[in-house]
Each structure stands twice: as structure tokens, then as C-alpha cells.
Amino acid sequence: MQPTSAVSRPAWVNAMNALTGTGGTIRKSPVEIVADAASVVTRSPYAEFTGIRTGKLGRWTDGVATLRADRATFASYWAAHNEQVRRERASQANENAYADPLWVVLGDSTAQGLGAPGPRGGYVGQALTQLRRTTGQHWRVINLSVSGALTRDVLAQQIPLLAEEQPDLVTCGAGANDILFSAPGKLFADLRELLKAVPDNTVLLDLPLLTGFWGIVGRISVPYISRMNRVIHEVALQRDLPVAEVSAHFTPPWAGKFSCDNFHPSQDGYRDWTRALLAAVPASSLAMS
């Protein structure tokens, strides 16, 4: 297959290249950075002898590697799905037919559904099914999210694509990756800038509090996430935007709610995210005709 020229590439390809570099390598998530460091131990000559390789630490690094391999599969699925939705909507427009309501998703790997068995097992796929069922309308979704995206990436690379889509509903959930990649001042400034840039028909997702989970790393992250959530709710109040309170729905007991990397939700965990999102979608959106 011949490489696609830059001119003829779909917008999502150019956005991906701008975000990750022309090689298309997605930025590592915080959990991948920690796992790579841990792999120095689990792959050492002594790991098999001491049992580390097959122990809890070794199984965890293997789980992270599994989800890392899934990223490209999930990204390819949503890219193909997005293009199919665009073609179908263009056909409806050409025929002056009723346009199905459109939901556009902004975010990171959780919006991609990473951690579920397949892309449709995340909160986007689950919520889409519920939206169609509860409204009786054939909602469409275009998922612009990118695994590893920071808030500034969503602002610079995903927000500009909204003008092409003309969505009826937008959701935006990002920020977890910023904790290792941004100084606190930059982190909160970027978050505020993103939240002020989303359109008026946006539902914001706050972040889950991993209290007591994932050991000391989870506990250290709590003050940052708590402050990020305060910023999200503060800006949402200023702009009169609804917030999907993932922090209130995705809670202990954790059994079965996390995937093999002990960071991303499992399909069961994403059910909590789905409930949080659907509870926040305005009635005006659900009543669209």
C-alpha cells in the first residue's frame, strides 16, 4: 500500500502526527513510565530465580505491556469508525435526510476505552448504546480522543477538529496524564484553558480518586486529582456546564473494576463511568428530535 500524502490525509491523521510526531508513537502514560522502570527489575537475570518475574510485580508489568499493545488497535478502530460516521452523515446531508444526533468525544485513553476487552467496552461505547436505547434515536459518535493525551494536547489538537463535526453533544475528559508531565502550575493553567475553550454543549468529566488503591502512587496522586476536580467544577459552575462526577461513581470496592495494568478501568469499571456520564447529559440533549 502506498503511503497517504499529507494533503489527502483525514484530519485525525494530521492531528495524530502533530501530537505524537511523524512516527505516530503515542506518548507514554504515567503508568507505562513506572512500569518501564519496574521492568528493569522484573527482566533482570535474578528475576526468575527470586520469583519476581512471575510475582505480583511481574504480572503487573506484563499487564501494562498488554494494554500498550492494545492502544494501536483501539486507535485504528475509532479512526475507521469516525470516517464511516462522517461518510454516512455526508450522505444524509446530500439527500436532505434527517441527520442523526452527533456526539463528539474529547479525551485520552479512557475515552478510547483502553482496559476493556474491545473499544466498544469503554464508557463511550456503553454510553452510546444507552443513549440510543433511552432516546429512541440513532445517536452517532465521533471519538477524537488519543491515548496519552495531555490537557494541552486536547486543546491544541482535538478542539480545532470540532468545527468540522458540528456536534449536538460534546464530552471532555482529560488530565490524568498531566500529573507526571506537567509542573503543578502548568497543569492547572492548562486545565483551565481547556475547560474555557470547550463549546457550550459540553459535558465535562471529572477524575476518579484512587484513594487507597495502587499503593503509594495512588495516594500521592490524590491531592493533585482533588485539586484538578475542584478546578473542573469551578469552571463548570462559571460556564454553566454539567459535570459527569466520575469521582462519585467510580469508587471502592475496586474488585473487578480495573484492567490488567491496575490503572485503566475494566469493562465493569467503565460501567461506573457510563452511569456518571449519562446522569450529567442535559435533558435538552436527550429530548432532541
For each feature predicted by the language model, list its residue ranges.
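Short hydrophobic segments within beta-strands
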Residues: L106-G107, L205
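Short, conserved loop/turn and helix-capping segments at secondary-structure boundaries
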Residues: G21, G118-G121, V222, S226
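Alpha-helical interaction segments
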Residues: L67, A127, C260-H264
